[in-house]
Amino acid sequence: MDDFAEGGLSLADDILLEDYPYEDDCICTPDFTTDDYVRVTQLYYEGVGMQYKDYAQSEKNLEYDICNIWCSKPLSILQDYCDAIKLYIFWPLLFQHQHSSIISRLHPCVEAIRSRAAEISLKKLQHLELMEDIVDLAKKVANDSFLIEGLLKIGYKIENKILAMEDALNWIKYTGDVTILPKLGSVDNCWPMLSIFFTEYKYHITRVVTENCNLLEEFRRHSCMQCVKQGELMKMRGNEEFSKEKFEIAVIYYTRAIEYRPENHLLYGNRALCFLRMGQFRNALSDGKRAIVLKNTWPKGHYRYCDALCMLGEYDWALQANIKAQKLCKNDPEGIKDLIQQHVKLQKQIEDLQGRTSNKNPIKAFYESRAYIPRNSSAPAFRTSLNFVETERGFRKTKYKMANGGDQNQKVADEALKGDDCDCHPEFLPPPSQPPRHKGKQKSRNNESEKPSFNSEVSLQVDLKSILEKQFSKSSRAAHQDFANIMKMLRSLIQDGYTALLEQRCRSAAQAFTELLNGLDPQKIKQLNLAMINYVLVVYGLAVSLLGIGRPEELSEAENQFKRIIEHYPNEGLDCLAYCGIGKVYLKKNRFLEALNHFEKAKTLISRLPGILTWPTSNVIIEESKPEKVKVMLEKFVEECKFPPVPDAVCCYQKCRGYSKIQIYLTDPDFKGFIRISCCQYCKVEFHMNCWKKLKTTTFNDKIDKDFLQGICLTPDCEGIISKIIIYSSGGQVKCEFEHKVIKEKVPSRPVLKQKCSSLEKLRLKEDKKLKRKIQKQEAKKLAQERMEEDLRESNPPKNEEPEETSDSAQRCQFLDDRILQCIKQNADKIKSVVLNTSTLLKELLSWKVLSTEDYTTCFSSKNFVHEAVDYVIGHLIQEKNRVKTRIFLHVLSELKELDPKLAPWIQRLNSFGLDAIGPFFTRYGASLKELDFHVVTVLWDEKYGHKLGSIEGKQLDYFFEPASAMEARCLIWLLEEHRDKFPALHSALDEFFDIMDSRCTVLRKQDSDEMPFGCIKVKNKGKKKKPKDSKPMLVGSGAASVAPSSEAVTPEDHSRRNSDSAGPFAVPDHLRQDVEEFEALYDQHSSEYVVRNKKLWDINPKQKCSTLYDYFSQLLEEHGPLDMSDRMFSEEYEFFPEETRQILEKAGGLKSFLLGCPRFVVIDNCIALKKVASRLKKKRKKKNMKAKVEDISKTGEYLRVKLPLNPTAREFQPDVKSEALSEDVKSIPGPADSSTLAAEDLKAQLDSDSSSGSASEDSRLEVASPDSPTPLCEDASPSPTPAPEEAKPTYWAQSHLVTGFCTYLPFQGFGITQRPAYINMVPSLSQFTSIYTPLANISSEYPMQRSMPVVPSFVASNRADENAAAYFESPNLNTEHDSGDHMASETQILEDTLGVCVRSQGSAADADPALSEPEGNSEHSGSSDSLWEASLENVSGTTDAPAAPSVAIQVSRSMVHQEVNTEPYEPFETQQGDLSQKEKECHLLREQLKVACENCEQIELRSSQEIKDLEEKLQRHTEENKISKTELDWFLQDLDREIKKWQQEKKEIQERLKALKKKIKKVINTSEMSAQKNDGFDKECEPHPDQSLGFSSALTDEKTKAEESVRKGKELYEESHQRAVAAEVSVLENWKEREVCKLQGVASQSEAYLKSLKLMSSDSATYPDVEYDILSWESFLSTVREEIESKKSQFEEHIKAIKNGSRLSDLSSVQLSEVSFPGCSTIHPQFLSESSGHEDPGLVACVDSMTGAVLNDPYMDSASGCPEEVPELSLGSPTHQPEVTQQLELKGASQVSPSEQSPEADEKLSGQATRSSQSPKKPSNSIIEHLSVIFPCYTSTELAGFIKKVRNKTKNSFSGLTIEEIVEKVTEHIVDEQKKKKPNPGKDKKTSEAHSAASVAKSSQSPPLAAAGPSARTKGQKKDDVPAPDGNSCEICHEIFKSKNMRVLKCGHKFHKGCFKQWLKGQSTCPTCGSSDLLSEE
């Protein structure tokens, strides 16, 4: 497995790659499948399930219990169980062999599973998907006890051979999925599917419940660790093979990995991807389905499954599967993007294929469509969803492999993919091509006639191979490389554009999009694989960028771009965004009306959006394309346009053209400033600066702006003088201002004349009306009061006279929005006591689905089930606050038979409210209900109430309007309320039903004066001057308040009388008379109370002036908070003050000193603020500091309390005679020291008194009771005009008078108290004398108190509504959020020990109120010393001295409090009684606190007096109303004047227009007469012209004929020249072909000759041992040359065909001319050559000599540019087939490297060949000659011997001590020197060049293998111009690489350094390399 390679596959592996049959072997006959599952169930029943059988026989209701236990589990766990059961059901169908045993289900690694991929037919796949839909039903209703119980029953029947077909179909119907039943009907036999589903689910649910089996863990334990490791290893190898494009091998590895880990969905997904590449779409479909079943939330599995369906032609099926996948994978944002893209692609494919059919095989069509795509194409494919697939990946690029069955696989080139990693996450790709067919027109794939034959497949493959090979040319790669660069640039520009747009860099974005649009042609957009919508999105991006810039020019261009989208691209679906963009443009221009029109159009086009779009070539989503976001944005814009801001100015120029609007805003894009001209009559005339300049030029002769001062106002009919001119600059600032003060004469105001009644009859009518109104008001109040009392009596059930009801229970009641739920909560204990059968109630609530199965199980699991069930249900209702469930609970209560008769009428009365409200509701909203989709309502009804009230299928909405269907009608309203999100039009109607109709209540306005109107504040009496006081709403009971209809209708006679008697400047119309009277009465009332501008009142009462100013500034500071004296508010308001007010402020020394003269104002940080605001700020700071101190002290105190031992002998532990009484939340005031008791009579009188003075003060008092009466600790606080201090302020004040026993809603206004709902609670049944004061030690802790209080008065105001008395105080130092409950048990200790409250315990428990006795202590309330210290310190500022009472504090244990007083010592702090009360530290601390409290008492009194003043100031709020009414009157008069002036102006304008029109008519008449005369003259002149036109037309016709003739001749000439050009190009290509073929044939002939000579020499193997090896090399070389000849011929023929088809020679790619090198062979010994020269051809010897010395190059193969010689590329054959050529190339490359750069491997190869060529012993001279013959093949052995002799003579006949290499080097240098001395000879240039080149190589190579690997030598016929340099990048003289451009290139092509060439020219005048004398060169 480790060394896995091609050719090494085993037989088993080959079998895996075979073509699998189409027939599916996993779903066979239904009988067998059913038997398989029934056998599984029987096995369970015979073994493990036998106990369940026996138990089922003994217990009939076992399914119900199993169902309850199953449904009691969390929903998430149940859904996981359902997924596991689904795997168990599908395991035999998709993953396992048919005949596998039951053991293999539990141990997949033991038995062989179906790892081998099997195809699934489309019919079988339909059955599988239907089965999957049925199985998924159970997951939807996993926690529905009704349906799960039915499932278990059906499974039980099937297992017992009972036919339950009808039950099964009904079960599926009740689940609500209406799509499955038609599918089941289309299946021939659906019973096997249903039996499998119900039996398997019943089997597994029973296992989970009875055996406590965890299906998830059981499924995960199937694979052992070894299997997991092996599977992971196989997967990694498969990933590697996939990245290498070896998909067949990757399939084998993935298959083996699946054998080890069959539950891994990634493996099936990877294998499906491989099958897609291989073209095996059915196998891919099977694996995709398996991956989905294993994990249905994996997006890639769904993607590949849809791809396989698409490749099979099932486009609609694939689209439906994609929609289902998006719903399942909605929590995966990355995966959902790819699925959305696939969805768009499928939709477009279906649209493209509409109306077109094809009978081709889809795979064959796929090959044909992809045949002409080049293999190595790098052009990226653009995704349909506008996402560009990046081709620059870190992995190797892979290609698609497609096959038409079995192992006949064909590679089809496509875009490269990113290889899978360990878990194999390749990118999603669209299929490479789609067959042009549609699902509706295709036949079954199983049709054998459609399968192509094997011969057709072979021919198809051969054609495809030839086509692909033709495309693998250099030009093709270059073209696609250019395409890739273009797309890269495109992506870069788009990314720059949208990135800049997201970063608000609009100019950069506009630049990028503009550059992009300039380069894109919409007509050629498809050539870039882009859709037209991509181009439109680029246009949209440019428009948005220009819009963001916001300048006028850019806005106009943006508007044009948006209009371009609408006009030219309406089919792309972006009209909505375009209209929205135009609206934004107009909104930027502040043209709100035009913007509103476009926004409205955009709202209507939201549905046309194509979906969520992304920027082209990216994954970045365009946020505006989200429909929900567009909708919200448009609604916001529409709201802004409907209510535009007030313009800063309005241009009055009649010819204003400022962006088609006269409104001037500072935010206008073209805003350039404006001018405002004001006159003394308060006229304001404004102009654009451009309009003002035009007006001055045309009307005022360019008058200077300043000269307009003191001129006449520009307003028509205004006689005022211009007094002020303000010019605003383009920045909105005041540029310059001119002002001239005009003293306006004060005209006395015209007195208001009241119309007096002219007759006594009218006076009598008025008095009668007043009397009637008063009587009606009193009757309405009385009626409302009676109904309120009646309803409250009904809402309060009969009481069982239980005086022990605790007052703390009232404090637990919170105010709820639902009044029915509030009533149930208040009477929870009564309801609990009357419900006798709790189990029946719970079952009914469970059936009505008020309680879930989990809640029902929780109730039953409780030990105290009977007593706590009702409490649990009510608490559950309060927690959910569901109005429907509350009323269902009330309905169930009313239907119970076993109910206490005392409470039954009350419950039935509450329940009947809803039934009574049905009629009015349907009468009012019947039309809206009839517009509903009743089919949807029917489905919802069957789901919710079908099992209780029956189905309403077949009925109409009119059925609910019948009186007999009141219950069903109410249930219908309940159903609409529960699904109100689906019926948005009924929200208000449903709220009205539940808030008003169903829970009857009336909100009345409580008036302090009985003479004021009751319903609303409407003043109809002119003479009534008294202002009504602030109304206080009062919540009363059931019933609707009705006011008697007013009988004020005026008869027509009265109207006539009024009209006749009316006096005044004008008569008021009848329809306005009543409104005018009301307005005048209201105005007279306000003006009579506060006359601001009445000088007499100002002079009479100067204090009232100051008081009014103080009120005004108080209101200003209340609205805006503390303000700086330099604030703009003061300066602006001061400008409008009258002169008298300014004088008052100037006398006081300014505004600041004036305000400080009033105690209401203070200065804080140079800001004026109200004193009460300052006190709040100080208290907040003080509170923060105090809390910090409390925390520190509490920590220290806790440490001292716990860690430090107490000293019992200390002085502080002695009993203290005077104990301080403190309350945590209520402060006490000093009282007489000798008053130790208070009589009950005084107490009663104090309670009954209505006075706010006397004994009741603003602070609560602490009293000490007599020993024989209950100890009063705190007296109830009565209302006072001064507010309570913040430290001990009651949240709601108690009323001083008694009220009846009902709940009243009293929001308190004023007094600085937070306004929250308050309720006056009272217990009428309790005595006022026995329950007012409660002993502190006996306060019950059953209900946790909201505040730590030592007293619970019986009658106070609180925010709790109950029939019992309760007190609720709020202190700012306590956090109300932590009120409930964890410190109640410690409150007694805190109050006794820490605060020192003196408590006199009762003698026995009987003396105390039994209802207040404390039950068993709660352990969770165990002590808190932190709360002790905190409570003691929070009220430091609020404590005062209290009268002392001699007592001994007693420590009470927490566990003993509820029984009686515990007098035992408390260990370990107490050894005897009273020790703990003498704590040293606490007493000292309390004394300090008392001192501080006494010192702060005076400050508190001052503060309270200040607050009293604040309350008095609040009574003067009518000043504000006076100002408002006066302002409104002024506005009314101004509007009237403005309208009159406007009418007058319009009248003048109309008259002027009329005059202008008359003048214009006269002018038109005159001009018409003149034009008629001119026309007569023109007619006379034009009469001869028609004759002349005939001559012109004939001349033009002749010219046209000549032009057409010349065009025809030109076309003929063009055709002839084109044919000649084609013939010429064809002849050129034929000549090139002949030349190349001749070259190769020459090489072939030479090779044949040499091969022939080698064969002749093969007889003498001793002399030439390697002759056989050389013969084989030359034969291989000869065959290669012949193949190359054929290849060149075919290439030239293709080019000739292309030329004939219309292509141009310049556009075609040139034929690659590869150089052919002879193979390297061993050198023939000179002896052999000399011996054979006598009987061999001399030419042959020369040929052999030249070929063995160097590689032969044909002269025709040399390039014309003289480029340096390189190693030739061989395009024929592969390295494995031609080892000789590879060896030759390696040796040649090694020989061209310097000795220092040669590698050891090259040396080894060279030395190896040298040893092979020199195996026989040789003489040194022969070896030297042999070396030299290789270097200088042009010299004979005799000539070389002569050179050796010359060198020996120079060295004085001594070669001793020199090696052969050194001798060869010296001889080589001598030969080169000899050649340089000779003159250049054209006939010998070749030999000189060869010698020089050979010498250079010899110098650079010192090793013996030079004999076998010398440099390339030229043939004798080679030209000197074609001799290349050794290296094109190095100097020919010094052989150094050119590092700069300082070089010289000769005409012959050789290159030299300029310095080297200058040195050479000093002694020579020829080319150093070729000896050319032509030295003309080019730089």
UniProtKB/Swiss-Prot annotation:
SMART domains: RING (SM00184), TPR (SM00028). It is found in: Nucleus; Cytoplasm; Golgi apparatus. Transmembrane segments: none annotated. It is an enzyme of class 2 (transferase). Gene3D superfamilies: Death Domain, Fas, Tetratricopeptide repeat domain, Zinc/RING finger domain, C3HC4 (zinc finger). Its EC number is 2.3.2.27. One of its GO terms (cellular component) is vacuole. InterPro entries: DEATH-like_dom_sf, TPR-like_helical_dom_sf, TPR_rpt, TTC3/DZIP3-like_helical, TTC3/DZIP3/RBM44-like_helical, TTC3/DZIP3_dom, wHTH_TTC3, Znf_RING. Residues 422-457, 783-811, 1021-1067, 1214-1289, 1402-1427, 1574-1601, 1757-1776, 1788-1821, 1873-1927 are annotated as: Disordered. The keyword Endoplasmic reticulum does not apply. TPR repeats lie at residues 231-264, 266-298, 536-572, 576-609. One of its GO terms (molecular function) is ubiquitin-protein transferase activity. Residues 1788-1799, 1808-1821 have a biased composition (Polar residues). A zinc finger (RING-type) spans 1931-1971. Phosphorylation on Ser-378 by Akt is required for ubiquitin ligase activity. Proteolytically cleaved into differently sized N- and C-terminal fragments. Pathway: Protein modification; protein ubiquitination. It catalyses: S-ubiquitinyl-[E2 ubiquitin-conjugating enzyme]-L-cysteine + [acceptor protein]-L-lysine = [E2 ubiquitin-conjugating enzyme]-L-cysteine + N(6)-ubiquitinyl-[acceptor protein]-L-lysine. Residues 1036-1050, 1248-1257 have a biased composition (Low complexity). The modification Phosphoserine is found at residues 378, 1009, 1060, 1794. Keywords: Cytoplasm, Golgi apparatus, Metal-binding, Nucleus, Phosphoprotein, Repeat, TPR repeat, Transferase, Ubl conjugation pathway, Zinc, Zinc-finger. Its main location: nucleus. Interacts (when phosphorylated on Ser-378) with AKT1, AKT2 and AKT3 (when phosphorylated). Interacts with CIT. Interacts with POLG. Interacts with HSP70. Interacts with SMURF2. E3 ubiquitin-protein ligase which catalyzes the formation of 'Lys-48'-polyubiquitin chains. Mediates the ubiquitination and subsequent degradation of phosphorylated Akt (AKT1, AKT2 and AKT3) in the nucleus. Acts as a terminal regulator of Akt signaling after activation; its phosphorylation by Akt, which is a prerequisite for ubiquitin ligase activity, suggests the existence of a regulation mechanism required to control Akt levels after activation. This is E3 ubiquitin-protein ligase TTC3. It comes from Mus musculus.
